[in-house]
Amino acid sequence: SCGKATTRMEVKIDSPDPQNVAGEIICKGANLMLGYYKNAEATSQIIDVNGWLHTGDLATMDTEGYVTVRGRSKNMLLTASGQNIYPEEIESKLNNMPYVSESLIVLQNDKLVALIYPDFDDAFAHGMEQSDIEKVMEDNRNELNLQLPAYCQITKVKIHFEEFEKTAKKSIKRFMYQEVKG
């Protein structure tokens, strides 16, 4: 959980079942922005006619008002069976596993694939070779899958040999990796 909303602010989850089904976080209050300066079109895309600010973040909220962020709406993956996958949740777990520097979960042929940029410096410092790194990543995949529901399980790991391209804010440019084939 990332906590509760501050006083003087209303927060809702735009979902038919906010406790169990993630929806977009929307908020309203005197302490929020009024819009984008001299850009009515951009403002109308995030602030609706009722004054609710649409954050683009997906979350659930418990009965006490605690919000748990699941990911970004633009990053959500939708499987052919209709399951919503929040890649950030899986990546967060994967990034804490041995020798993983950073990762990206993508959908390929309706299967979840982990693109992993290993911590090569650490692995090589421990005397590992490429084949050892590949084995560790496969072990990580198996361990991770024990923690995930069946519909979220990773079917394959692909080693990425360079850091993922980033935005100015140091976020991975996901769109560059979504259509990876093979």
Q: Which residue ranges define each predicted feature?
A:
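C-terminal boundary motif of the adenylate-forming
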Residues: 14, 58, 96-120, 145
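Short, hydrophobic beta-strand segments
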Residues: 75-77, 114-122, 160-164
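Conserved C-terminal "lid"/linker of ANL adenylate-forming enzymes
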Residues: 102, 110, 141-182
